Each structure stands twice: as structure tokens, then as C-alpha cells.
Amino acid sequence: MKLSQVVVSAVAFTGLVSAANSSNSSSSKNAAQPIAGLNNGKVAGAAGVALAGALAFLI
């Protein structure tokens, strides 16, 4: 059961990253580089939350 929860969280995380990357790639043409950096920071923060959730399931 724990393994399936980790797999589900990993799939949700990859879906989140792919959605963020697609939105960034389409809007980065008109966006300034600092704004793109902030978006990357938000993606990294979401990655940390997803990893913390996966570790919480393992413990």
C-alpha cells in the first residue's frame, strides 16, 4: 500500500512538473528572465513538497 502511494505521488509530481514546464515554455517568450526564475523556484518548491509527502508515506 505504501509503495502504491509513493508511485501515485511520483506520477502526480511528474504531471505537475510537465504542466509547469509546458506553461513556462509557452509564456517564456514574452516573460522576463527573473519571472521565469521565480516560476522555476515555485516548481522546485512543489518538488520539495511532493518529496516530503512521499517520505511521510514511507515512514
Curated annotation (Swiss-Prot):
Transmembrane parts of this sequence: none
Entry keywords, A to Z: Signal, Stress response
Domain of life: Eukaryota
GO biological process annotation, one example: plasma membrane organization
Organism: Saccharomyces cerevisiae (strain ATCC 204508 / S288c)
Gene responsible for this protein: HOR7
Protein name: Protein HOR7
The keyword Signal appears for this protein: yes
GO cellular component terms, A-Z: cell periphery; endoplasmic reticulum; fungal-type vacuole; plasma membrane
Additional comment: Present with 6140 molecules/cell in log phase SD medium.
Stated family: To yeast DDR2.
Induction: By osmotic stress.
Signal peptide: 1-19
